[in-house]
């Protein structure tokens, strides 16, 4: 482990370097000015502290922007423990700034998978005054890892044999080993965690997909709020965030000229739309791949070529996966690519690209160029560059989305946490979406910062539309 661990009555953290705290604090101050939604919520609720003494575990990229979210949750009363949701996404100066305030944080850039899952367990382990180990009352999740760990741990205590089944990946084997260890070291721990757990708010598409799968199987243990599908998250973070941060990641990793290159974007959902726009803005010739005829038609109407991955092999210079699905780029695709092709992912997990299969190929030489940039040379002499080991390129090779767009997402997260706690006795064990009036509130909080002035409906106009003058203005089924 290359992290610094400190556990005392006044500090509890595992980070890279606490001396980076001053730098982190300076960037936090800058970010706060770019995050009007979070800061407004902080001011509004600082006196009433709606999350007073609520134990919250966060599993979300430990960036400067996330640090502003953490301090917002703390300022409205929460007792917070945090880990990153990706082995490469932590900004070490952000983690140091949070650790320096006394908030337990367990994250550093470049964790191993074993370290990552240990950090996740650390983040969800709270100690009661009598010394009993317990868990969070609320969870902020990104990708569903905390939710997965608690559910699998609880199932193990109730007779599940999943941990003894063959693992489908190295990461799954790490999770199973951790659960076996906890079963020995902390008997009955997951039952105590579930007893107090009141809800989770989920940040990203992949995590939401996991939640719906668990709910459909009748195994969801708590109410969950799908933050990802709030309009002010999916249509802003996923779209406009990727539009800026994808090119940033590619440029920092490879210093590559994008103009004139053939770039393949796999998937044309919100993330794919932002990614395709990012590459086209720099002059790349973009090819989109899609399974969905509606998304394919959208891409075509925007002027993109829509074709298969196979049709691009040997001619494309850059590949970006955005789908949230697995095996999008296979090892056979990688071997058939143009020499020196750049391959990366901006979907949540690394299984969009068959990285494990690539590493298992015989006679393939791996050359590390710099952190998160690896060159794989095939026996025929051709090579590809794999960025961030197939994980999120914008966070692994750059610093992720800009602060302003993350203020939208994190304002939603904060409101979701408040909503889950205030309605903890009425919410059922199913997946919810934040109501439209809160979605509109989040948008409204960001308008002044960019000089937007809204038109106001007259009473007659509002009556004609069948809405309130103050909103909400659209029905839930409206597609923005």
From Swiss-Prot:
Q: Which residues bind substrate?
A: 63, 142, 203, 233, 237
Binding residues annotated for NAD(+), in chain numbering? 204-206, 238, 267-272, 290, 325, 346-348, 394
Is the NAD keyword given for this protein? yes
Q: Quick one: a GO biological-process term for this protein?
A: L-homocysteine biosynthetic process
Under the heading InterPro entries, the entry gives: Adenosylhomocyst_ase-like_sf (IPR042172), Adenosylhomocysteinase-like (IPR000043), Ado_hCys_hydrolase_NAD-bd (IPR015878), NAD(P)-bd_dom_sf (IPR036291), S-Ado-L-homoCys_hydrolase_CS (IPR020082)
Per its UniProt record, what SMART domains does this chain match?
Answer: AdoHcyase (SM00996), AdoHcyase_NAD (SM00997)
UniProt pathway annotation: Amino-acid biosynthesis; L-homocysteine biosynthesis; L-homocysteine from S-adenosyl-L-homocysteine: step 1/1
Name the GO cellular-component terms. Answer: cytosol
EC nos? 3.13.2.1
Q: Give the cofactor binding note.
A: Binds 1 NAD(+) per subunit.
Listed HAMAP family: AdoHcyase
**What does this gene product do?**
May play a key role in the regulation of the intracellular concentration of adenosylhomocysteine.
- Name the UniProt record assigns to this protein: Adenosylhomocysteinase
The species this protein belongs to is Xanthomonas oryzae pv. oryzae (strain PXO99A)
Taxonomic lineage of the native organism: Bacteria, Pseudomonadati, Pseudomonadota, Gammaproteobacteria, Lysobacterales
């Amino acid at each position: 482990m290359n992290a610094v661990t400190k556990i005392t009555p006044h500090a509890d953290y595992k980070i890279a370097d606490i001396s980076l705290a001053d730098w982190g604090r300076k960037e936090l101050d800058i970010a706060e000015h770019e995050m009007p939604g979070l800061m407004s919520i902080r001011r509004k609720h600082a006196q009433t502290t709606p999350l007073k003494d609520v134990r919250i575990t966060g599993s979300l990229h430990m960036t400067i922007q996330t640090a502003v979210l953490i301090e917002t949750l703390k300022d409205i009363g929460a007792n917070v423990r945090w880990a990153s949701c990706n082995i490469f996404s932590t900004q070490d100066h952000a983690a140091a700034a949070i650790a320096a305030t006394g908030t337990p944080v367990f994250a550093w850039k470049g964790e191993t998978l074993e370290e990552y899952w240990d950090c996740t367990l650390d983040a969800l382990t709270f100690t009661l005054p009598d010394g009993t180990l317990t868990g969070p009352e609320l969870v902020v999740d990104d990708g569903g890892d905390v939710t997965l760990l608690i559910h699998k741990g609880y199932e193990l205590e109730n007779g599940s044999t999943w941990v003894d089944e063959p693992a489908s990946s190295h990461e799954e084997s790490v999770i199973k080993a951790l659960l076996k260890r906890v079963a020995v070291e902390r008997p009955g721990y997951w039952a105590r965690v579930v007893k107090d757990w009141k809800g989770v708010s989920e940040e990203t598409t992949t995590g939401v997909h996991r939640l719906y799968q668990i709910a459909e199987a009748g195994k969801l243990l708590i109410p969950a709020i799908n933050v990802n599908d709030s309009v002010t998250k999916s249509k802003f973070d996923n779209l406009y965030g990727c539009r800026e941060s994808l090119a940033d990641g590619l440029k920092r990793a490879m210093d590559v000229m994008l103009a004139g290159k053939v770039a393949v974007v796999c998937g044309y959902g919100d993330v794919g739309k932002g990614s395709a726009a990012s590459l086209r803005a720099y002059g790349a010739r973009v090819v989109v791949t899609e399974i969905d005829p509606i998304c394919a038609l959208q891409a075509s109407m925007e002027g993109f070529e829509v074709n298969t991955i196979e049709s691009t092999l040997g001619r494309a210079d850059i590949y970006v996966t955005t789908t949230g699905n697995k095996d999008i780029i296979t090892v056979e695709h990688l071997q058939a690519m143009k020499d020196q092709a750049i391959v990366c992912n901006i979907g949540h997990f690394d299984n969009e690209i068959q990285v494990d299969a690539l590493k298992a190929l015989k006679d393939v030489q791996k050359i590390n160029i710099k952190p998160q940039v690896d060159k794989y040379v095939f026996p025929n002499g051709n090579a590809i560059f794999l960025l961030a080991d197939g994980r999120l390129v914008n966070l692994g090779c750059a610093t992720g989305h800009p602060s302003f767009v993350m203020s939208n997402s994190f304002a939603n997260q904060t409101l979701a946490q408040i909503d889950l706690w205030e309605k903890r006795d009425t919410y059922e064990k199913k997946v919810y979406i934040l109501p439209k009036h809160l979605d509109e509130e989040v948008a409204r909080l960001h308008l002044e910062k960019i000089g937007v002035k809204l038109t106001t409906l007259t009473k007659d106009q509002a009556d004609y539309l069948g809405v309130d003058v103050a909103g909400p203005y659209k029905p839930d089924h409206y597609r923005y």
